[in-house]
Amino acid sequence: MLMVPNIAILSGGFSCEREISLMSGKAVKKALDSLSYNAIEIDVDSNIAQKLKKTNPALAFIALHGPYGEDGCIQGLLEILGIKYTHSEVMASAVAMNKVMSKHIFHSLNIDTPRGYVISREDVLKNNIKVDYPYVLKPINEGSSIGVHMIFSHEDYLELKNNSSTIMEKMIIEEYIPGIELHTAVLLNEAIGTMEIRPKNKFYDYEAKYTDGFAEHIFPAEIPNNIYRITLEHALKVHQFLGCKTVSRSDFRYNPQNNTLKMLEVNTHPGFTELSLVPEIAKLTRGIDFNELVKIIVEDSLHHRNIRDQADVEQCY
């Protein structure tokens, strides 16, 4: 009789994306239960190391989003504890989460990305800004469009300044790219499809991402064939260059007025509910339903993930 592995679903955590993480965790738990895995949900807190030692899972399914969850922190802890885990490893997670580092990677791969730079809170409040309207102000290490400000006019800037609590000490400011929002899924080292998003709001914000009916999903994206092909090529190129594992999602903006495509970011831990983009693309392109997608991620992580044995690490004397 085959042993069924114990799987710890890590969700919750400390970030602003906690609620979304809990939703992802519950969706994964439901899928794993239906697949007859032994699954337990763990709400990640400061005692996570002790919880993992007590649970001793064969695999940790990372359903965390945002800081500490997809930036290499939890991955590093799992490496130290010798526990296999899903999604990307430490370095890929850390670099992809940092929008400044990501831009350097995109440039090195000759992939266009919006012009931008790191700006201090002080310079934002003094309006010492070197980018013309419209522009985008966003955190360096956040996801789900949390803390993102679309500034189309001086009136928008004044509103931001009057509600300055969301302006962090260091942020990234970018030119605004008008046009079409695109998301490309990579699964098992293959770019499987690109979806177009048409939000009901001005942009694809937190509400539009996680509220049914606030955005229209168009598949395949209604863009020129050559642009569609380039989204697939760029998403796979970045996925492979960073060393991403199993699954990732790359985000783009396409401006049909001047036929330019800009890569915004790569997400190593994309949202993972049945309404999320990667599961939807997998279903539409490969006929893979949510439960099967969860199984693919679990099996790939169990059988193709090597955790370094501490005994193999070279000792320094």
Swiss-Prot record:
User: What remark does the entry make about the cofactor?
Assistant: Binds 2 magnesium or manganese ions per subunit.
Instruction: Provide this UniProt record's keywords sorted from A to Z.
Output: ATP-binding, Cell shape, Cell wall biogenesis/degradation, Cytoplasm, Ligase, Magnesium, Manganese, Metal-binding, Nucleotide-binding, Peptidoglycan synthesis
One Gene Ontology term of the molecular function aspect: metal ion binding
Pathway(s) the chain acts in:
Cell wall biogenesis; peptidoglycan biosynthesis
> What PROSITE patterns does its record include?
ATP_GRASP, DALA_DALA_LIGASE_1
Q: Where does ATP bind?
A: 130-183
- Give the source's domain of life in one word: Bacteria
Query: Which compartments is it annotated to reside in?
Result: Cytoplasm
One Pfam assignment: Dala_Dala_lig_C
Claim: Plastid is one of the keywords in the record: no
What are its GO cellular component terms?
cytoplasm
Xref: HAMAP family: Dala_Dala_lig (MF_00047)
Instruction: State its role.
Output: Cell wall formation.
The protein here is known as: D-alanine--D-alanine ligase
